Swiss-Prot record:
<protein>
    <recommendedName>
        <fullName>Spore wall protein 12</fullName>
    </recommendedName>
</protein>
<dbReference type="InterPro" id="IPR027267">
    <property type="entry name" value="AH/BAR_dom_sf"/>
</dbReference>
<dbReference type="GO" id="GO:0031160">
    <property type="term" value="C:spore wall"/>
</dbReference>
<keyword id="KW-0325">Glycoprotein</keyword>
<keyword id="KW-0749">Sporulation</keyword>
<feature type="glycosylation site" description="N-linked (GlcNAc...) asparagine">
    <location>
        <position position="117"/>
    </location>
</feature>
<comment type="similarity">
    <text>Belongs to the SWP12 family.</text>
</comment>
<dbReference type="GO" id="GO:0030435">
    <property type="term" value="P:sporulation resulting in formation of a cellular spore"/>
</dbReference>
Amino acid sequence: MKDFKKKIIMKISRIEYKHTAFSAEYKDVEKVYKKLRDNMDKVATGINNLMTYEHGGSAMKKIYHGLSMVSSASRMNYFSDADIFEGFARINKDLTDSDLDEGVREVGRKTAEAYENISKAKEKFNEQCGREMEVLMSMKKRAETTDKERENAKIYRYDLEKAKQSNNPEDQEEVDRLSELFENSQTRTIEMMRDFIGADGLQGVLTRVRDLNIEFHQESVKALERTK
């Protein structure tokens, strides 16, 4: 409540900052921090899409549309509980019937096995990305704490500027106290914003998801290469 009242006072009783300023480092880091903080939901949506595309979206709709052209409704239900990889594995398993050509059966068997492995690799990818989504959720709380410290820094700057503008020698002790509070708050806030941005923050999440995606696609290629 005290901070809220202070923010109201700062809006009503505006001052021109002549003697105090945030450092260039602070302003540069804050610019990046705010950009990333404001795009966290987009990042989460993007990761969620990577985790779920095999169960829905335009890719699955196209597959179902193609199947509907050649399959009955009961046949469609055969694929309804499968992801696109498992679904294609089932299609290929149907080509391993003993009354089919041996060459077709062999291709069907190998391809079915490959896509079953791809489906398992995707499940692993999804599980690992799920942990990154949990990191993003915890980062929302970190952003709230960081924004609170940013507000504190603004308040200290405001109070320091007013104390300096009073030009009263008797206020020098208060000026020194507020100067220390302001500088310490700036330092803490920069550190918190850098943590949010860097390897322990959003950059780390994006890097790990990228690496997980590389690993998944490499495993997929290996599985398909074995069908040759």
